């Protein structure tokens, strides 16, 4: 599922380069989704992406919001 999701995000990113950019955050929501799924896997990455998209609304200030770094196991 992870590879399918990453492929679909790549397809979306290719198509979206021809559309005006509207994301309020850096990195963009699609880049965030790709990084989150690549780092945490399909399920946790999708949950992080969902939370990010919920925050991306018209009256949100936006700004720099990277994917959280994984916690190191001791």
Swiss-Prot record:
It is a peripheral membrane protein. It holds the Pfam family YidD. The keyword Cell membrane applies. SMART domains: Haemolytic (SM01234). InterPro entries: Membr_insert_effic_factor_YidD. One of its GO terms (cellular component) is plasma membrane. It is found in: Cell inner membrane. The keyword Cell membrane applies. Disulfide bonds: none annotated. It comes from the Bacteria. Keywords: Cell inner membrane, Cell membrane, Membrane. NCBIfam families: membrane protein insertion efficiency factor YidD. Could be involved in insertion of integral membrane proteins into the membrane. Belongs to the UPF0161 family. This is Putative membrane protein insertion efficiency factor. It comes from Endomicrobium trichonymphae.
């Amino acid at each position: 599922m992870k590879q399918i999701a990453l492929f679909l995000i790549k397809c979306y990113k290719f198509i979206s380069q021809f559309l005006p950019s509207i994301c309020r955050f850096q990195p963009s929501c699609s880049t965030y989704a790709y990084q989150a799924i690549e780092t945490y896997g399909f399920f946790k990455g999708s949950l992080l992406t969902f939370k990010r998209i919920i925050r991306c609304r018209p009256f949100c200030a936006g700004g720099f919001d990277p994917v959280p770094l994984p916690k190191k196991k001791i």
